[in-house]
Structure formats: structure tokens, C-alpha cells
UniProtKB/Swiss-Prot annotation:
It is a multi-pass membrane protein. The chain crosses the membrane at residues 21-41, 59-79. GO terms for biological process: photosynthesis. It comes from Rhodomonas salina (Cryptomonas salina). The keyword Ribosomal protein does not apply. Seems to be required for the assembly of the photosystem I complex. One of its GO terms (cellular component) is photosystem I. It is found in: Plastid, Chloroplast thylakoid membrane. This is Photosystem I assembly protein Ycf4. Belongs to the Ycf4 family. It comes from the Eukaryota.
Amino acid sequence: MQTRYDLILGSRRFSNYLWTLISFSGGIGFLLAGLSSYLGVQLLPFGNTETIVFIPQGIVMTFYGTIGILLSLFLLLNISLNVGGGYNSYDKSTGAIQIFRLGFPGKRRKILLQYKIQEIKSIKLSIAEGLNPKREIYLQTKDQRQIPLTRVGEPLLLSQIEEEAVELANFLNIPLEGL
């Protein structure tokens, strides 16, 4: 096998779908409660909004509802554009490494980094435990640049990230640092 291809999951993670649904549902609820207090009409199918005074509670609920809906639309846009998604491609026959990621719309929506295997010094494994654990694999070039190879989001299991780093270092036939 001369080629290795790793897909990188971007913003199309389960947690993003869940937070989009939660913020949209909450936003609709708050917006309808605020509008109900303004119009004097029961817009919510549950609960009683007759006791909510428009100033100040109704205005605040309308504001929070609008913010919740806008946040859910932003998350939905991220999911549909797959921001952060892409691939890592390693081809031993041509000696090329390609790292591709998608970003936000604009001039630099598509990011493609290309390196030769000869330019790579090592695979670096960075592990930091604590309240916000960080477990990442980096491609370290001979000019000391570190290019992250792992996806953003929830950290992988320690055994899983170590196994991935060892497999990649063995495949590229370069040393592994930080293990």
C-alpha cells in the first residue's frame, strides 16, 4: 500500500446537530413567549404567558429568542459548509503529502497544504491532560513548523491517538516524538 487517505470530520459532528436543535428550540420558545406578551395573544401551545409583562420581561425574552435563532442559523451554516472538514493524503510513490481543509466562504475557502515527505522531520504527539485535555498529532517539518493533523473537537482516547500516530510514523518511515 503506497497511499494513505484520512478523512477529517469538520463541523458535521453529532454535537453540532444537537446544539443547533437545542438553540433553535429554545430560541423559538423565547421568541414566541416575548411576542405573546407584546400581542396579548397566547402563541405558545404550552404554558401561560398572560402574566409576562412586555417591559422588561417580554423584551428580554424576544431578544434572547432572536439570539438563539441566529446562533442556530450560524451553526446550521457551519454544518452545511462543513467548516473544518477535509482530508490528509500521504502518497509514498510520489513522496507527496496533501492536507486539505474547508473554511468559510471567501477567497480562502479551500486550504491545501502540500509537502514532500523529505521535508518532514517527524510526527509529533502532543498530549495535555487536565480540565481541557488536548490530544493532537502534528506533522513537524524540518524548518520547525507544526501542522495539525487531527480534527478539532472532542479529544480522542489516549490509546487511539497513540495508535494513529504510530501507524502514521511507520507508514511515512519517519520518527515519532512525544510518545
